């Protein structure tokens, strides 16, 4: 991270100041400013967070007085002549004492003027780092510091200055975390400034933080009544130990976190913004100034916990500086630090001192309003009163949501059980976005991986909070914190889940002290003795370093040699063999390896995650279940077949291992970063794991440039190469659950009349019978392990055995390994076949017309096979031929005469209309060129106002809240066409989306800006800089030539922070976003909602896109967002359009741009006649045309002398904007025509997954996009995931975050669960 310090610092408390006061009204001689009677000191408390309020009071300590004589002063009183507060670091000219050497640029702290009645004018007070006194210079002699590292270059030999810079950076980071809800300091010790005359400081421990109210919840033994405080009103500092580590209390339950010094990523560089508050919370916060036992800023707060951490590959060099986002867990975790970060990140020194030495000198008798009660509880800020109702309401809601979670999913040994009732703490968490190139370590799931006899008994209880040395009798509180880790092993991200309807937030993590891990069986001497005597095998229940340091260590445990101190080592959280590898004592009492768990060693808890429930599924109804199964049932079958094919290639003598899924861990391929669904190959020595595709490619010897692999493989122990034949086949899904569900799918589709078009009936695939589990004779089942699953809420086919003794395949079964992929096997099995290499990679992407015999020919077609459904009948499921893509529109826009049978008077849904029309109208009855007219509801018998744009190729729905929208939408959507919905701005709260509201709330945040004309990234700017020029060209940042720049905000809000930064805007958007069945997180047709909470849910937004307009004729060749495509579907909402002042003839230029963009007449009339506000010009292309566009761009690149690297892609690189000339060539040379769409204020553009698109802002726009996964486009989602494997690791899309296979599996699992639960209705009907 490069931390820029030229922006204003956010707090007054803790800052040094200079003041000049008295009755003398001057005049003051500025030539002798250094001789004025200045008073210096430090601010300890403030009465308001708004420094502009005229009644602002501050509690200060003066340098020439003792702290006991602190006082409250009025900043804007008549006697105050000048009041300066330290603000930012700059470079200032400094001459040597002799004056013979030319001046040098020296880092200095500037002071900002709050009051200046003496007329300082251009004079600025600064303090050179390394000195104590302040001097005054002209503003012209100051230069901004671009970053901390650049300021250190000329000062490498000055240790004092370097240390002070580091201390300032660390202080600034701590202030940011404190103000933003304690994001990285949960469990940290802090010291709080005391307004009690008897003491200056007292200590407390951070329990939780509330991002919405920006307050901290603390546990203070000195003042038990103190619960919450506001760090913006009272001086708070984090306490560090002698090693520069954040001191963590061992008394508070839950996960303890340490603040980080850097974030390791440009994306993560942004400071966490101040969260949005409601109108009731928006007044100026003030508190009375009270002494005695009084504390400023006491406010109610929600609980908040976070987690941190994780290391790089085993053969990567360590880098010990790291960002520390956080998470939550039900238990305390031993402290572990990541061993590495981005190579470009320079860590701060470990021995930094947070608090520069301050001399506290005397001051006058303080003026105060005595607290009548003399209690800390008597002082409540106005912020507290304004937030109490809303906060309590939120806490109540969270409590209700999380009450079902009180029963822990993790079983703990009796040694860890608390004797007292557990206190449940609600959690509300936000984690900053971080770079995705760093390998994360896994977090701990303490539930057992097997039910072997040696395992300790478990109970369903919480974890006792451990009391440290500071604990006092009578003050012990057992706290049970509902928390979970969500960490991806090989990507720098961690996830926390609020509840099943909420998304996850990401961030890199460091696991800190006090996560309580179940006591290892080896810690019990009596049990160890018994195991030694019996020779019984048991599962490794700790890290390699703790359990078996002399045996092979996994990749994470081997990284301990890079870690600096013992506290960082031996964490079970990181171990890849935890609850996976089996161990055994030999006859000499020496511990040795005894293989790994096998698929038949599952328990009901493990299998329940993968089998459908026998009761109705929340958020899913019968009709929707049928529709989902009709759309993705075949894809699921192909998924099962591909797994069977891989299993059939495994030699009979090879044992398949089972690695159970770990809660919150997204298992990734160590080579290509693709999410592993089930099968993979694992190294038994170090835990290295690769996906099916990477294994097959390596095994077949596919190389790139004849000297390197397409994907690099990390080396094993002692630098040994990982050879494919030495890797161990491993599955995640226990037992035969995958194949059992496949059988259930066929049974259910037959019973419900859902016609299947899967290749399961193909003779070639009949040979791929259900694989049998290979039994390890040494893994004996324990009593109780053979429990019948019929007692659980699982759906199993009656004929499917539950735990019959597995049978090893016969030697002749190897013949199935030679079965080649049939052309009838569609997209899924072919994509994962072994024919993917650098030579033929592009052949897989060839258009259908050029690759007739490829199984991928089904890719462009989004229509699903016919199915005899009751509600979703054959008409809606029948594929539409290519030459009749406008069939429905032709019918709907025709005269509407009755058919022979006549139309139903009140059809239930649109499908009935389609069925009736399709059965009774011929194509010859339809006009050849339908007119783009609005359909009258009375004609069709349903109320779905809409019209057609783009020459009748684009559906535009007019009522965003119409309940019939999704039926009309679905017909176009399933054919891969974009759709638009208008009028959403009438539903939204307009005040929330105005630029001034963003400027007011987040103006001081530091961000990166992008120059849309040059793609240059501008650093060191603030959010306020962007919004100042949003509607005022004269206020925009300018180039060196003095031209105003056309800018867009880069990744703001940063990462997945939208909900936490802007909760009211999030609620406003989710409440009014059209087609909620698809777009809401819990929408019944949003397949991402079917992924269980056990998994890491993908980040689907919302995300904001804020940019100026490109108005001039020269700007028409530039794009606000260049041509690209997304792995998921998206709904992009235009929430605000700003027409900037300061430029003439804007309307004329915008009209020319719209016309130049190939817009149709109806679109132009919306601008010229209806006077709607146009925001952005879109060009969207069908997903099936992607390869043609790719070939065209490569051709143009070659014409321009550009290279086309193998691991880059002209579309995924987002390096092209198709102007009119390129669009014309694309149409003429490749026959590709897209949709030219002008998005007006309130329009929502729906972009199908895999559809290339580009955006050109006409005016300044604020857009918000929400992603989703629809049943109609799952095929494209998977295809894109395969494409992204070939991108370089620098691409944001390289990593597979959508987990398409998991989404398909669990969506089908839930659908068949609903259908099985309603089979009784079939007999009645």
Curated annotation (Swiss-Prot):
Residues 249-284, 300-333, 372-399, 772-791, 798-819 are annotated as: Disordered. One of its GO terms (molecular function) is histone H3K9 demethylase activity. GO terms for cellular component: chromatin; cytoplasm; histone deacetylase complex. Its EC number is 1.14.11.65. The keyword Zinc-finger applies. Binds 1 Fe(2+) ion per subunit. It catalyses: N(6),N(6)-dimethyl-L-lysyl(9)-[histone H3] + 2 2-oxoglutarate + 2 O2 = L-lysyl(9)-[histone H3] + 2 formaldehyde + 2 succinate + 2 CO2. Residues 274-283 have a biased composition (Polar residues). A zinc finger (C6-type) spans 669-694. Fe cation binds at residues 1124, 1126, 1253. One of its GO terms (biological process) is regulation of transcription by RNA polymerase II. Its main location: cytoplasm. The keyword Manganese does not apply. It comes from the Eukaryota. It is found in: Cytoplasm; Nucleus. A motif (LXXLL motif) lies at residues 888-892. Histone demethylase that specifically demethylates 'Lys-9' of histone H3, thereby playing a central role in histone code. Preferentially demethylates mono- and dimethylated H3 'Lys-9' residue, with a preference for dimethylated residue, while it has weak or no activity on trimethylated H3 'Lys-9'. Demethylation of Lys residue generates formaldehyde and succinate. The JmjC domain and the C6-type zinc-finger are required for the demethylation activity. Leu-Xaa-Xaa-Leu-Leu (LXXLL) motifs are known to mediate the association with nuclear receptors. Belongs to the JHDM2 histone demethylase family. PANTHER family: JMJC DOMAIN-CONTAINING HISTONE DEMETHYLATION PROTEIN, LYSINE-SPECIFIC DEMETHYLASE 3A. This is Lysine-specific demethylase 3A.
